[in-house]
């Protein structure tokens, strides 16, 4: 019983650390791509870039959909609510 409990605990810790690492990587990659985007215009190119980036991240690492979708929704919501001009 104790062996099973310790194994399940270790498995949970590993899964949590992996999800945190992937979320930090996805956030940094989104921020780096956003910092490159500068100028005035519509938000559709930004949305396309974010969509392609998320597609690549999902294919490359297999991140849980719920975590990625929540992060992307926050980033896209911030881009859409912000001004159209400037560096994102």
UniProtKB/Swiss-Prot annotation:
It comes from the Eukaryota. It comes from Dictyostelium discoideum. This is HssA/B-like protein 13. Pfam families: Coiled. Belongs to the hssA/B family. One of its GO terms (biological process) is sorocarp development. InterPro entries: HssA/B-related (IPR008455).
């Amino acid at each position: 019983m104790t062996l099973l409990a310790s194994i399940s605990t270790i498995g949970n810790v590993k899964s949590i650390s992996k999800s945190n690492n992937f979320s930090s990587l996805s956030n940094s990659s989104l921020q780096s791509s956003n910092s490159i985007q500068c100028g005035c215009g519509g938000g559709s190119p930004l949305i396309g870039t974010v969509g392609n980036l998320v597609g690549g991240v999902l294919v490359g690492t297999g991140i849980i959909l719920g975590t990625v979708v929540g992060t992307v929704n926050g980033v896209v919501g911030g881009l859409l609510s912000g001004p159209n001009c400037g560096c994102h």
